[in-house]
Amino acid sequence: MADVQERLKKLGASARIGTGKGTPRRKVKRAPARSGADDKKLQQSLKKLNVQPIQAIEEVNMFKSDGNVIHFAAPKVHAAVPSNTFAIYGNGEDKELTELVPGILNQLGPDSLASLRKLAESYQNMQQKKDDDDEIPDLVAGESFENKVE
């Protein structure tokens, strides 16, 4: 029983500022939640631009210069056409272009099509290298396998 009380005293001592019984416990410092304030400021500035919600948008893809894509599935989109401003809300995922290829062919611009061609060429080159690494010699008419091995 005595060692339990000693352990409790050690635990209690770490949670107190002073050493006396009447001292208050240490307050936990918490960082203020700023994301809500940032969202409110963003909403206010978008409201000044007179943005309107755009309905029925299934996905948004943003093509990056390195060939990857930021993909938003079922985002909320607001637009202010006169000021050429668009706001996209949702969880974005970084994906490679090859993951989205069948569904986004009609969305690709000339730059993205060029990067897609490069990806296809590199994929074909990798496949050819895999096929060539078999270490099986090619046979020519009139030669036998034993002659080729020696």
UniProtKB/Swiss-Prot annotation:
Just give the chief location class.
Answer: cytoplasm
**What Gene3D superfamilies does the database record attribute to this sequence?**
Nascent polypeptide-associated complex domain
Per the record, where are the segments of Basic residues compositional bias? Answer: 23-32
Q: Which Pfam families match?
A: NAC
Keywords, A to Z?
Cytoplasm, Nucleus, Protein transport, Repressor, Transcription, Transcription regulation, Transport
Please name the PROSITE patterns in this protein's record.
Answer: NAC_AB (PS51151)
Q: Where in the cell is it found?
A: Cytoplasm; Nucleus
An example of a Gene Ontology cellular component annotation for this protein is: nucleus
- Annotated ranges, domain NAC-A/B: 36-101
What's one GO BP annotation on this UniProt entry?
protein transport
List the residue ranges of the region (Disordered).
1-45, 123-150
PANTHER family named among the record's database cross-references: TRANSCRIPTION FACTOR BTF3 FAMILY MEMBER (PTHR10351)
Oligomeric state and interaction partners are given as: Part of the nascent polypeptide-associated complex (NAC), consisting of EGD2 and EGD1. NAC associates with ribosomes via EGD1.
Q: Which family does it belong to?
A: Belongs to the NAC-beta family.
Role this protein plays? Component of the nascent polypeptide-associated complex (NAC), a dynamic component of the ribosomal exit tunnel, protecting the emerging polypeptides from interaction with other cytoplasmic proteins to ensure appropriate nascent protein targeting. The NAC complex also promotes mitochondrial protein import by enhancing productive ribosome interactions with the outer mitochondrial membrane and blocks the inappropriate interaction of ribosomes translating non-secretory nascent polypeptides with translocation sites in the membrane of the endoplasmic reticulum.
Name this polypeptide is given = Nascent polypeptide-associated complex subunit beta
